[in-house]
Amino acid sequence: MKNNILMSVLLTVSLSAALPLSAASHVDVVKMRTENRVNPLGIGTSTPRFSWQITSDRKGVVQTSYQILVASSREKLDRNEADLWDSGERNSDEQLWIPYQGKALLSGAQAYWKVRITTNKGKSEWTEPQLFTIGLLGETKWSGTWIGLEDLQPGEQKGMHTRLAARYIRKDFAAKGKVKRAVAYVAGLGVYEFYVNGQRMGGSQALQPVPTDYRKTIYYNTFDVTSLLTEKNAIAIKLGNGRMFPMRLEKAYKTPFFGYPKCRINVKVEYENGKTETWATNNTWKLSFDGPIRSNNEYDGEEYDARREQALKGWTQAGFDDSQWQKAERCAIPDGTLMAQPMTGMVEKKFGHPVSLKHRHDTLIVDFGQNMAGWIGFQVRGRQGDTIRVKYAEKLQADGSLYLDNFRNALSEDIYICNGRENGKSWRPAFSYHGFRYAAITGMKNARKEDFTAYTVSDEMATIGHIETSDTILNKVLKNAWWGIYGNYKGMPVDCPQRNERQPWLGDRTVGSLGESFVFDNERLYSKWMHDICDAQRSDGNIPDVAPAFWNYYTDDVTWPAALPFTCDMLYHQFGNKQPIIDSYPSIRKWINHILAEYTDKNGIITKDKYGDWCVPPEKLELIHSQDPKRKTDGKLIATAYMIRCLQLAEQFANLQGLKEEAKAWADRRNGMIDAFNRQFLTNKAGTSRRPGHVLYPDSIYYGNNTSTANLLALSFGIAPQ
């Protein structure tokens, strides 16, 4: 798609990471991607897609051809020995989502690729090699079992404020020779930290894996652990709740219960002598729930008792005495399909120290000067048994205390119980994040600004758009928008990071995803979310208002589920990725047909809409044209307008796949609904002239009760007659 290639070029403004080409060409190939990721490990397809961008200090540079080489080793690729695939020189300006078409890539395969392009200004050199590996493609490629504990333990509870201690699981393994390559595949529900010989894997990654409906999809992560293995090895994992063991369980009809934390791990080891083996989870692994993390709850926070650290000292290293630990239970196999995580997921980034500390009675109020989503780390000093509490908030009351009404019943508090030996040790939670600018700290004496550090925790993605104006207020609005969007990327787009909700509402992103895409490279997040929405669809075609369906809100709405076709369209036009359209089209078709069959009246109008013009902003007097004092837009008008747009998108999606008959059927249905919409909602007052040069009387043509919403939808969705 030429428009997407042009966008790729325009968005690439930095040459700092460029790969050098011939001096005469003045062209650089940058941002090489496999499945839109940099050197990804364990991708979930045997036909990956390659992308790159070009930059130049000249104008009018256009790619005219490319050649891709893929090899099974770096050495072969350096010799231009493409034993997996040589695309040959292809006359094309395409730079996005070029599909691999070489030899079959099997589970665990490792490959290297590079590209050379020709432009109207000359030919480039070969780029530097890029790496990708294939994950475990299917259940039959996995060994071992799911392990964990399948019940509550002493001190744990369901109900309004669920409590569950972290699960600590480990096993030692002896290598049977010199290791050539070792790869770990880790599925840990709900969230986990994974260790090999004492080394925490994943770097800055946090709260892995990204959340899904575990009844449908379970993501695993892949780690290359070759350099960490020795003769004796320890494989260990710490499991938190995430969304697996939900934060609230007092309403069974509303919140699905997925089960208790569990894991499945495969470490595939390849030796220099050609032999292989798999270290896999089973009931010979050992488990403890008596570690320091006594409770972890996304709404309520994390409780950490450092007095329990000593008993687990060295638990992630080989040779640890786990004889007093219990055997891990073999758990029921989750219903969800194991799949490679298609995105990096959340990462922790250091924000900085507070801008102010203020004492209020026995409480210290810290202000970081910026609302964000993440957690606070601090330097621990105290006597054994001292309790440090960190209570989070987004704003303060007039008296300087925390304002907490907007948190509702989310406790949002991290608790640390000292062992008396910390002496300034740094601590921060592992399995709970918060929305905050402020925090109230109790239990710390002689605290300083440098004792506290805020960290953001959100999905890893680049900022690709920046706007700065001469207006300071507008600049502040834009800055706040950046922080608001970024703080709500949590492996899925959520509505808020602070209160007892944090749900992936579809309606928020029906239009929001498009606006966000001008600021963030959010393709991986939203492609993953399309899969979530399809997972959440019921057999009758109903798509819920929240997906993954962590709340059972199947209201049969139109405007909220419209996020599926709307966002698929965004991914195609903004990032050139048509795969979400292809994958989601059956669900879109099923949903549209369901709504049309169940909620179309005899006049051709959609009768069902739950939310209407949700949270409509106040209007200035000069913008009010409606004579209706309530100015509430008819839900039928909104639902029908959105369905008309969805039918238009369905037609486009069908044409994109060559489904001409389906495309025509969608177009016919859309045209009929447009006629019905205009008959039902369009007012054309007598005396109105449609002749050129004649005056059009104010408010003589309008939709519904003449609200801004009613008129704008008709214009935006191409419903208003010419």
Question: Which residues fall in each region the model found?
Answer:
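Bacterial Sec-dependent N-terminal signal peptides
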Residues: 1-27
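Extracellular/oxidizing-compartment recognition motifs
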Residues: 25-110, 114-499, 507-508, 524-527, ...
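Conserved, charged catalytic cores of large soluble enzymes
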Residues: 71-72, 133-139, 204, 640-657, ...
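Active-site acid/base region of carbohydrate-active enzymes
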Residues: 190-191, 281-290, 438, 448-480, ...
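Thiamine diphosphate
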Residues: 552-573
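Core register positions within helices of long alpha-helical scaffolds
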Residues: 567-570, 646-649, 653, 717
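TPR repeat positional signature
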Residues: 568, 640, 647, 710-711
